[in-house]
Curated annotation (Swiss-Prot):
Its EC number is 4.3.1.2. This is Methylaspartate ammonia-lyase 1. The active site is at K330. It is an enzyme of class 4 (lyase). The lineage of its organism: Bacteria, Bacillati, Bacillota, Clostridia, Thermoanaerobacterales. GO terms for molecular function: metal ion binding; methylaspartate ammonia-lyase activity. Keywords: Lyase, Magnesium, Metal-binding. Involved in the methylaspartate cycle. Catalyzes the formation of the alpha,beta-unsaturated bond by the reversible anti elimination of ammonia from L-threo-beta-methylaspartate (L-threo-(2S,3S)-3-methylaspartate) to give mesaconate. It can also catalyze the amination of fumarate and ethylfumarate, and the deamination of hydroxylamine, hydrazine, methylamine and ethylamine. It comes from Carboxydothermus hydrogenoformans (strain ATCC BAA-161 / DSM 6008 / Z-2901). Its cofactor is Mg(2+).
Length: 420
């Protein structure tokens, strides 16, 4: 079926763009924003409003498919594409992408996604990850609408996957309101929590003291508020700050994490981004050493790779090297939804945990599509998004998941009746 027309509409994303380099360098908070000058190219201030561009494909059958172009909160660092400002890219979409979309005969998602994600701009470079992300979302939605099926079923059929009809564990993030938002997560029985946003050495504390105190508080809070059968996974994102407070001494970090694991037991413990060693090569070596050191200590702490692990090629390098027990597949950073699917499947095939993440700075559209990718590919966990308020993102993603599972179950029963 052909695409008759395309519209590009500027909108808002679910959070903000933050200059991580400036924050790590000591930018002082000022209400909800930060004082000081930005350090990362493309930023006009340390924190600025998140933006999105909706791509709407008008199909011959009258259906309208939608995908949202968005980028991560911490854009422009650790090998990522620059900060995504809508006004800078709508003209590119109109002049360079739209002529290729209008009249395109859309049959299968994989074929279309491969074609459009490999397009290059006038300088011969692949388009910004945000453009590829939004475009492939819209293409997936379009193929589902053409076939009158769910996006999860499109992925399963085209990639030869079995739909298990089981929910994927959801991982919510607290932001700086790590106490209030943890309460919300406990009351709503979030599977993996709380993220914590330990993105500054002062938050993590000298030799991890503040992180330990918070983890112990969280354990007790779950006993106080949680149901007796509620045992969530503890997942803390420390943005390399353990490296800062331990002077990148990986042995000391491993010892600290092994002790922390004992203190939070019986909750499983996952630590994302324990160090940021400044380059992909050093990061791979460091995370590999740290995970192996933990194993020798008899620890089951899972190290989660994030920084420097951005695109499909990066993810394969981290997985092949054993650099951590889990990789975050940060959806906007990979660009195409097709690459996201392949990344999850590759990690699972190699025995590495696949954390299908993303960013608080996404939208309801991209979050719902991530749910379908998750149901089809079966990662270890899905990040709750967009926003940092817990309830909104959890409502969007949990409800989309449960609705889709109900549809899939009904479709399965109907199919069984037909063949029976």
């Amino acid at each position: 079926m052909r695409i008759k027309d395309v519209l590009f509409v500027k909108g808002s994303s679910g959070f903000y763009f933050d200059d991580q380099k400036a924050i790590k360098s000591g930018a002082v908070t000022d209400g909800f924003t930060y004082k000081g000058k930005p350090l990362t190219p493309g930023f006009s201030r340390v924190r600025q409003g998140g933006e999105a561009v909706s791509i709407m494909l008008f199909l011959e059958n009258g259906e309208i498919a939608v995908g949202d172009c968005v980028a991560v909160q911490y854009s422009g660092v650790d090998g990522r594409d620059p900060v995504f400002l809508a006004d800078n890219f709508i003209e590119v979409l109109e002049e360079e992408i739209k002529p290729r979309l209008v009249g395109y005969n859309l049959v299968r998602f994989r074929e279309a996604a491969r074609y459009f994600t490999n397009l290059t701009d006038k300088r011969g470079k692949r388009y910004h990850t945000a453009l590829r992300y939004g475009l492939t979302q819209a293409l997936l939605d379009a193929v589902a609408k053409i076939n009158r099926t769910t996006m999860a079923e499109v992925i399963a059929e085209e990639y030869g996957l079995d739909l298990t009809l089981n929910p994927v564990p959801l991982f919510a993030q607290s932001g700086d309101d790590r106490y209030i938002n943890a309460d919300k997560m406990i009351l709503k029985r979030v599977d993996v929590l709380p993220h914590g946003l330990f993105n500054h050495p002062a938050k993590t504390g000298e030799e991890g003291k503040n992180l330990t105190e918070y983890a112990l508080w969280l354990k007790q809070r779950i006993k106080t508020l949680g149901d007796h059968d509620y045992l969530p996974v503890f997942h803390f994102d420390v943005y390399g700050t353990l490296g800062t407070v331990f002077n990148d001494n990986l042995d000391r970090i491993a010892d600290y994490l092994a002790r922390l694991e004992e203190k939070v037991a019986p909750h499983p413990l996952q630590i994302e981004g324990p160090v940021d060693l400044g380059s992909k090569e050093r990061q791979i070596e460091g995370l590999k050493y740290l995970q192996e050191k933990l194993i020798t200590l008899g620890s089951k702490v899972i190290i989660v790779a994030d920084e420097w692990c951005n695109n499909l090629s990066d993810i394969k390098e981290f997985v092949d090297a054993g650099a951590g027990g889990m990789v975050q597949i940060k959806s906007p950073d990979l660009g195409g939804v097709n690459d996201i699917i392949e990344a999850v499947l590759y990690a699972k095939e190699k025995g590495t945990g696949a954390y299908l993440g993303g960013s608080c700075n996404e939208t309801d559209v991209s979050a719902k599509i991530t749910v379908h990718v998750g149901l089809a590919t079966g990662p270890a966990q899905l990040l709750v998004k967009p926003g940092m308020g817990v309830d909104e993102g959890l409502t969007i993603m949990r409800n989309e998941m449960m609705r889709t599972l109900a549809i899939l179950q009904r479709n399965k029963v109907t199919f069984q009746k037909k063949v029976g």
